[in-house]
C-alpha cells in the first residue's frame, strides 16, 4: 500500500496514521475478521481524470480495509492467477502497463489494426451473484467468500450521501481486468 501511495478513505486515516498504532490496528482488524464480525466501511467515491478529458469513478477504501483486502488477496491470488488469460495485464503480479505496451509493440508487427475498447460502467453493472459463482468455483474457504461478498455489497459514499445502487450490482471498486477474458472468448484468434 505504501508503494502505490494509496490515499486515505472516508475515515481520513493515512498509511502513516495506521502505522502509528500498527500492532493495535492489526490486532483489531484480525480480531474482527477472524470472528466474522468485520464489515467493510463505505468506499469513498472520487472522480479520476481521463486523458480524453472525462472522468471515471474510483472507489477508495480505508487503509484498514485495504489491509483486510490484502489478506484475502494473499489467499485468492495464488489459486486464481493460473486461470487468468495470458493477455491479461491488469492488477496481476509481475505484470504492468509497461508489459502490456511491450506486447502491443511486438504485436503491431503482425497486425495493422487495434481495438480500443471501454465498456462504460462495466464494474458498476456486474451481477454480484455471477461474480460470487465464479469465485466459488475456485475458492472454498468460507471466510474468504464471506468477505468478498461483503466487499461487493459495501456502500459507496459520494460526498456526504450514500450512492444508491441496484440490488446485486457493482460499485466503482478498482477491479481486476475482466473484459480481456470475455474478448478472448469472443475473438479467440485475435492476439
List each model region and its residues.
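Charged boundary/loop elements
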Residues: 1-17, 74-90
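Amphipathic alpha-helical blocks
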Residues: 7, 17-40
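Conserved polymerase palm-domain catalytic core
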Residues: 32-47, 51, 83-191
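Conserved phosphate-binding loops in nucleotide/dinucleotide-binding enzymes
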Residues: 57-58, 62
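Duplex nucleic acid-engaging cores and interfaces of nucleic-acid transaction enzymes
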Residues: 63-71, 105
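PAPS/PAP-binding and catalytic site of the sulfotransferase fold
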Residues: 71-72, 131
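A broadly conserved amphipathic alpha-helix scaffold signal in soluble, globular proteins
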Residues: 73, 77, 102-105
Amino acid at each position: 500500500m505504501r508503494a502505490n501511495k494509496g490515499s486515505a478513505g472516508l475515515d481520513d486515516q493515512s498509511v502513516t496514521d495506521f502505522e502509528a498504532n500498527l500492532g493495535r490496528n492489526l490486532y483489531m482488524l484480525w480480531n474482527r475478521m477472524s470472528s466474522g464480525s468485520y464489515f467493510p466501511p463505505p468506499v469513498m467515491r472520487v472522480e479520476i481524470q481521463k486523458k480524453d478529458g472525462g472522468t471515471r469513478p474510483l472507489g477508495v477504501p480505508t487503509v484498514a480495509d485495504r489491509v483486510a483486502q490484502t489478506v484475502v488477496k494473499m489467499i485468492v491470488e495464488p489459486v486464481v492467477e493460473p486461470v487468468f488469460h495470458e493477455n491479461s495485464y491488469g492488477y496481476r503480479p509481475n505484470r504492468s502497463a509497461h508489459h502490456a505496451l511491450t506486447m502491443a509493440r511486438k504485436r503491431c508487427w503482425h497486425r495493422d489494426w487495434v481495438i480500443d475498447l471501454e465498456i462504460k460502467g462495466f464494474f458498476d453493472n456486474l451481477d454480484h451473484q455471477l461474480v460470487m459463482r465464479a469465485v466459488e468455483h475456485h475458492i472454498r474457504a468460507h471466510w474468504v467468500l464471506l468477505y468478498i461478498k461483503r466487499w461487493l455489497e459495501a456502500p459507496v459514499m459520494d460526498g456526504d450521501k450514500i450512492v444508491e445502487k441496484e440490488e446485486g450490482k457493482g460499485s466503482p471498486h478498482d477491479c481486476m481486468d475482466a473484459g480481456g477474458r470475455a474478448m478472448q472468448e469472443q475473438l479467440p484468434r485475435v492476439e
